[in-house]
């Protein structure tokens, strides 16, 4: 493998955008580098929930469990689901090749 995997972002209107993403970066970093609207107000420091994304169960189950700090932030996310995670906490690995990431229509910055 060349050190890249395919990541498909599903935007709120159902539009899909598939990109090749380097292993080792976060979903938040990949979204930003591809001009996708995933806020990340705290720049990945686990101090907000604006990079909230929803994963398919298959890929959600391949990730390590969220830390307590991530769970605390997820509790504040708008539209939380059973497969919600913070994009800043999902680091790409070969095992995540083909992952689909839904970007919810709205996010909530708790600092507002």
Swiss-Prot record:
InterPro entries with a match to the protein in the record: 2Fe-2S_ferredoxin-like_sf, 2Fe-2S_ferredoxin-type, Adrenodoxin-like, Adrenodoxin_Fe-S_BS, Beta-grasp_dom_sf
Cofactor dependency: [2Fe-2S] cluster
Keywords: 2Fe-2S, Electron transport, Iron, Iron-sulfur, Metal-binding, Transport
Residues that hold [2Fe-2S] cluster according to the record: 42, 48, 51, 88
Keyword Membrane set for record: no
Keyword Glycoprotein found: no
Domain called 2Fe-2S ferredoxin-type: residue spans: 5-107
Gene Ontology BP, a term: P450-containing electron transport chain
Role according to the record: Ferredoxin are iron-sulfur proteins that transfer electrons in a wide variety of metabolic reactions.
Stated family: Belongs to the adrenodoxin/putidaredoxin family.
Protein name as catalogued: 2Fe-2S ferredoxin
Organism (species): Rickettsia conorii (strain ATCC VR-613 / Malish 7)
Record gene name: fdxB
